[in-house]
Amino acid sequence: MGDVEKGKKIFVQKCAQCHTVEKGGKHKTGPNLHGLFGRKTGQAAGFSYTDANKNKGITWGEDTLMEYLENPKKYIPGTKMIFAGIKKKGERADLIAYLKKATNE
């Protein structure tokens, strides 16, 4: 598992412009990520997803996030997430460790 503190820095640098993680956090360009783990794609209440996200039908967890965060548009063709991805596996592991903690508090 990755390093939560390093993951928080990655989130602030690469994700926080479009996403929030706290319970009751607002949707921005991207959805609030609270409760992400164990939720199916395209299911955050009140966020307008593309059909690609709604129809992907996978459940978010460490393995699915590891693959998605490497190249979001390859994993879910048609997603409106414009982020290019994180190529370094260690950085993805750190981010996932942070998300696992932060989206569950």
From Swiss-Prot:
Residues with PTM N6-succinyllysine: K56, K73
GO (cellular component) term, any one: mitochondrion
Protein name: Cytochrome c, somatic
Primary gene name: Cycs
Role, per record: Electron carrier protein. The oxidized form of the cytochrome c heme group can accept an electron from the heme group of the cytochrome c1 subunit of cytochrome reductase. Cytochrome c then transfers this electron to the cytochrome oxidase complex, the final protein carrier in the mitochondrial electron-transport chain.
In-chain residues carrying the UniProt-annotated modification Phosphotyrosine: Y49, Y98
In-chain residues carrying the UniProt-annotated modification N-acetylglycine: G2
Record localization: Mitochondrion intermembrane space
Membrane-crossing residue ranges in chain numbering: none
